[in-house]
Amino acid sequence: RQRQMCIRDRRKDPAERKRLINSADFVFLCLPDAAAREAVSFVENNHVRIIDASTAHRTDPGWTYGFPELSPEHREKIRNSKRVANPGCYASGFISICYPLVKAGVLPQFYPVFAYATSGYSGAGKKAIAAYESDDKPEELLSPRQYALDMNHKHLPEMQKISGLAYKPMFNPIVDNYYSGMVVSIPLQGRLLQKRFTPEQIRDVLYDNYKDSNFVEVKPAGSECVPDGFLTSCLLYTSPSPRDRQ
């Protein structure tokens, strides 16, 4: 098809957006939730395929969750779907751990899951990025900061639903003074599991789930798997801790 460009001063013109959306094969939405829903409402044919990066459709039963590494079934659904919701950043790390463990019966659906995560500020929005990158940024931005203390983080619904958990997890996100990257940790209490699992067994469950993946790599148990204690890659790594007595 011939390429069509939306003139900059018409990019918020509903009629122009509607015309371009319906003339496209694929539409990528990088918009706030309300604007993403509006854009989807413009579709008037059956051939347009949409990939939405917002939170708007991640738990919508009419949409496919766009995490192909989770399973062959996920890959097949994405391949055939015309509506794909891109996973959230924290949710990607959380679900990559919980989904295989729930699926394999290691993690009970009713387990009281707690997750701790630290991330850079790039996903916090334009205002936050500007504040962090300002020459005169306030002193409080120099240190890690907790947020979403009301336990109502916008990623919680997808974290629960896609992982197959009966309840929303307790989630403690922290933003720090660096641009991008995150670490998501989920401690498991062995005495609360249905039976005893060693770190090696848990690692094997994760490895079997992701052994054919190009973008998820399961590391050996222990910090020695990380050179110098740091990761400098866009890949997703998982690694169980070797503390099997808790």
Where are each of the predicted segments found?
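Short secondary-structure boundary micro-motifs
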Residues: 51, 223-226
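Detector for Asparagine
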Residues: 22, 45-46, 80, 86, ...
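Active-site-lining helix/loop region of Rossmann-like oxidoreductase modules
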Residues: 14, 99-222
